[in-house]
Amino acid sequence: YILENYKYYMVLGITSVTIFNSIVYYSLNFTQVISGVLMISTIPVMIIFISSILKIEKTNTFQILGVTCSFIGVVLIITKANLGILINLDFNKGDITMVFGMLSWATYSALLKKKKHELSQLTLLEVVISFGFIFLIPIYFIEYQVGYRIVLNQNFFMILFYVVLFPGL
C-alpha cells in the first residue's frame, strides 16, 4: 500500500518535515517570537483556503466564522489586547520566509484530508517522517559544503530530540 502511494506520502513528508520544520526554525533566527506565533496562528485560515482551492473540502460559513474568532482570540491573547503591538510590528526576512513554511504546512494538512488512509496513525506518522528525513539529507550536505558543521555534543542531541519528536506530534 505504501509503495502504491509513495508519491503521495513523499509529498506529505516534504511539505511537513522537510519544508515546514526547516523554514520555521530558519525563520525564527530573523523574526520576533510574537511575529512567528501570530503568523503560525493563521495556518487554519490557510488550510481552509488551500483545501477549497484543491477542492478537497468545501468551506462553510461556520468554519470561516470559527477560524476568524480563533484568530482574533489568538491576537488578543498574544498582544494582551494592546493593538499598538500589532501596529508596531515590522516585517522582515524571517516573517517572509515564515509565510512559505505556513503555506507548506497548510498544503500538508489539506492533502492529509484528501485520501482515506489504510495505515494506522502511527504507521502514517512513521512513513511521513521517513520521507521527510530522506529529503533533509541533501540539505545537510549543502550546509556541510557551505561550512556549517555539526558538533556531536549533548546540546546537539537535546536539540535533535526536540526537533524530531515534538513537531511531528
Model-assigned labels for residue ranges:
Residues 1-35, 39-40, 76, 164-169:
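Specific transmembrane alpha-helical segments of multi-pass solute transporters/efflux pumps
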Residues 47-49, 53, 85-144:
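Transmembrane alpha-helical segments that form core, pore/gating elements
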Residues 59-81, 136:
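Hydrophobic transmembrane alpha-helices of multi-pass small-molecule transport proteins
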Residues 39-53, 68-69, 131-135, 158, ...:
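Alpha-helical transmembrane segments of compact multi-pass small-molecule transporters, enriched
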Residues 2-6, 79-104, 141-162:
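Juxtamembrane helix-entry segments on the extracytoplasmic side of multipass membrane proteins
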Residues 9-13, 25, 37, 67, ...:
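Residue-level signature of transmembrane alpha-helical cores of multipass secondary-active transporters
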Residues 7, 34, 60, 122-123:
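Residues that define the loop-to-transmembrane-helix transition and helix capping
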Residues 29, 55-57, 117:
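Membrane-helix boundary and inter-helical linker elements of multi-pass secondary transporters
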